């Protein structure tokens, strides 16, 4: 049976560094929905993304449940294949001496570094997405020399290259 919700949270609470960052969250997100979360700083938007990516876990209580892609327990490798996230944490992990071509290529492998043995097929995928996003001119530029806008679009291309089911953009 197909579940139309890829994210289904009922009454979840999460703590981070001893502080409650999510309180009694009830939220369902369907596959067909585009969602924008708006709120003041400290309201839990980025923490929700950490829950979705399984970087933090909710407190388990009788009344609560959390399903991602219809599963209460999901393999992290499956999750990483199906969800791509672009946020400041990702931007800070990127080697500043990586060229944009290699940055985007690294998204296929879920790494943040230079990939030595790239196949022709993978190189073609990178060239294709760079052309589609109109950033082919950035191919040989180093990440550290890009403008903020160029960094963001390059990171979005990196996230999209693996064709995720879900794309999450945090402060992009």
Predicted features, each with a name:
Residues 7, 21-24, 139:
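Conserved structural motif at the start of ABC-family nucleotide-binding domains
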Residues 68-84:
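ABC ATPase NBD coupling module
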Residues 117-118, 142-146, 150:
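Conserved ABC ATPase signature
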Residues 120-138, 163, 168:
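Conserved ABC ATPase "signature" region
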Residues 38-40:
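The feature captures the beta-strand-to-loop junction immediately N-terminal to the Walker
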Residues 53:
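Helix-to-loop junction immediately C-terminal to a conserved catalytic motif
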Residues 48, 156:
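Hydrophobic anchor residue at the start of the ABC signature
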């Amino acid at each position: 049976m197909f579940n139309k919700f890829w994210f289904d949270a009922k009454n979840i609470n999460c703590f981070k560094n001893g502080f409650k960052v999510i309180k009694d969250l009830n939220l369902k997100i369907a596959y067909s929905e585009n969602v924008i979360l708006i709120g003041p700083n400290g309201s839990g938007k980025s923490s929700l993304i950490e829950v979705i990516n399984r970087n933090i876990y909710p407190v388990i209580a009788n009344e609560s449940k959390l399903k991602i892609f219809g599963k209460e327990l999901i393999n992290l490798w499956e999750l990483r294949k199906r969800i791509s996230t672009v946020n400041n944490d990702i931007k800070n992990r990127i080697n500043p001496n990586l060229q944009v071509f290699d940055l985007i290529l690294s998204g296929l492998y879920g790494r943040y570094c230079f990939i030595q043995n790239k196949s022709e097929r993978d190189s073609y995928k990178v060239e294709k997405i760079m052309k589609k996003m109109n950033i082919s001119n950035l191919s040989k530029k180093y990440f550290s020399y890009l403008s903020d806008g160029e960094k963001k679009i390059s990171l979005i291309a990196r996230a999209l290259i693996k064709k995720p089911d879900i794309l999450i953009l945090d402060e992009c």
